[in-house]
């Protein structure tokens, strides 16, 4: 028996959902806030009327499926119109898992888990029987988000969660673990940071750069993660040419400090791994000299995410074949590696020639180490000045 549904949205997602599940659903019509949209044509020969949002009626048209990446805003609008989440409407991700009867793999934690969820979607054998859904543990949840998370907790078959030293994070994880059905399979992932490439004398892992402005809910604003040496230069009024000279002469950090710092990183990583169901430290030790493994202190390159994903797939008895991504799965800038650090760690690539992926408000750019430093200096010096004048929080 086909499911009777209404689509909220007439764009790319709605067309893709229709194309994939047209044999399983009966579409009554579509809804849009845009009064100019009057007809939804998912494919040639198929036309459906588009209506403006209305208050809840008898519900004879079927379950409303929100076919939009901005489903949270639309869900709020539906709630204000009298609709009940998961009774009268749900977003397309949940609808897909319901229609296909795939087992939900709930990934709960930081952006590391989001990257793994994206990788799992690229594993063909896994995708035949499982539906990965990521949920962040660091955002305030509104009414719909709380209900959605509860729905996922009650219906997931596998729960992969991130563990940190945060008391709040521990409390959230324990609350979910105690609510899970005993038959749900669980995997714990320690949220690792790696400062080996980026040693600093003043560091608070995963804290906002004191000389940057953070956009609400996002880490990938320009220079979100700070460089304490450059920040100190800015605070002391040291000019850009003097900064260039110090870096070129490899006078930023001495070799003993770099190696001692790296030794501390290995101890911390190995300690964290003891509490994790994943093994990654050995891979980092074997490969960190050969190629860049981390974009900045808290965000990894795709190759690390592939290693984590392969372990999830092995745990579930699936093929570890993953289609490689064309772009970084974690949206944050690559921080430069000081030449003195590259020399002390005996890195096998030339950091002078490395093209760094820099996020800007105009989009992504590839820049040299000198261009990165110049932009960091100019941007963060201005923000440092504005904060000093109490013109920014």
Regions inferred by a protein language model and the residue ranges of each:
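Glycine-rich adenosine-cofactor-binding loop
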Residues: 2-21, 107-109
